[in-house]
Design a protein with these regions (language model features):
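A general alpha-helix detector
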Residues: 39-43, 59, 77, 101
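Short alpha-helical "recognition helix" segments of helix-turn-helix
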Residues: 90-95, 102
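General nucleic-acid-binding
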Residues: 1-50
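C-terminal structural segments of small proteins and small subunits
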Residues: 99-122
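Short, Lys/Arg-enriched anionic-surface-contact patches
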Residues: 8, 55-74
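Short, amphipathic alpha-helical "recognition" segments used to contact nucleic acids or chromatin
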Residues: 72-86
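General marker for long, soluble alpha-helical cores
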Residues: 14, 89, 117, 122-125
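Residues at alpha-helix boundaries and the short loops/turns that link adjacent helices
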Residues: 50-54, 66, 85
């Protein structure tokens, strides 16, 4: 049986930074990777060429390991559940992810670049703006 800790609120590292711009908080955690590199631009362009779920599945099957794809899918589902008000313990039990993963997703939802919010809004029928 999976045992999870229940957590509420933000990770300790974010306490006291509510006044900082979200982009600055996000940069504090993601400084070692260049999200604007030519390789990332190429990946984004490749994703934007995909037109159907079948094309997307085929590309992801070629590009990602099963574990990587499962991790990405679990993170997106965790983001959906967090945005619907589910708590860490419920998400941990349902998805089998660690509270550390849920905490990272929560941090990105609240202080990230806005990618989760855009995708979730569009999946729910909004424009994501």
């Amino acid at each position: 049986m999976l045992k999870c800790e229940s957590r509420t609120g933000l990770p300790i590292a974010l306490n006291g930074v509510d006044a900082a711009p979200k982009s600055e908080v996000y940069k504090m955690f993601d400084t070692s990777f260049d999200y604007n590199s030519e390789m990332v631009d190429r990946l984004c362009a490749a994703l934007l060429t995909l037109k159907t779920p079948e094309e997307c599945r085929a590309f992801l099957a070629d590009v990602c390991t099963i574990g990587e794809l499962q991790d990405i899918a679990q993170r997106l589902t965790a983001a959906q559940l967090l945005s619907r008000g589910r708590n860490y313990q419920q998400i941990c039990a349902e998805l089998g992810v660690s509270t550390a993963t849920i905490s990272r997703v929560n941090r990105c939802l609240n202080y990230g670049a806005g990618g989760y919010k855009t995708v979730l809004a569009r999946l729910e029928g909004g424009d994501g703006q």
